[in-house]
Regions:
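A late-sequence structural motif
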Residues: 102-142
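Hydrophobic hinge/microswitch elements
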Residues: 44-102
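Short beta-strand->loop
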Residues: 4-14, 89, 97-111
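Flexible hinge/capping segments at coil-to-helix
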Residues: 2-43
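Structural motif corresponding to alpha-helix initiation and N-cap regions
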Residues: 1-2, 71
Length: 142
């Protein structure tokens, strides 16, 4: 079965934590992540590779306490104070309002990518086309 990826957009990756975890971090961001308990996407994803490279470039050695395949579960662990979590910038306001997480900073030039996956090369369904068009209002052009 063939499928086609249609890029919806890219956005910066932010780091968020519960207020209690954020208070325990010391020093300026991103050095405050050194030794901190963090929650990450699984290591077989492009965003994880980019985050690992960014952390290494910052000279930061966090303590990885969990790896997740979806942001909903990652958010719940962060909400319950289990660690600092990377969050796509487009979800920061939602995570702040719904989970009480606070932003700590962004991961430099690391970008999360979002795709619509379809069975058609050229999208025809009006609803899917509308989503693709609206995505440019949500995502940055980086």
């Amino acid at each position: 079965i063939g499928s086609y990826n249609h890029l919806l957009g890219r956005c910066a990756e932010s780091w968020m934590a519960s207020p209690a975890v954020a208070k325990r971090l010391s020093g300026p961001f991103p050095k405050s992540l050194d030794g901190a308990r963090i929650l990450l996407p699984t290591d077989d994803t492009a965003i994880r590779v980019a985050l690992d490279q960014w952390l290494d470039k910052q000279g930061v050695r966090p303590f990885i306490v969990g790896e997740f395949e979806d942001y909903a579960l990652l958010r719940e662990f962060a909400r319950h104070g289990r660690g600092v979590a990377p969050v796509p910038e487009v979800l920061v306001d939602q995570f702040r309002k719904e989970s009480g997480l606070v932003p700590l900073g962004t991961a430099g030039k690391v970008r999360a990518e979002f795709y619509a996956i379809s069975m058609e090369r050229k999208l025809r369904h009006p609803g899917v086309v509308a989503i693709l068009e609206k995505a440019s209002d949500v995502f940055d052009s980086a």
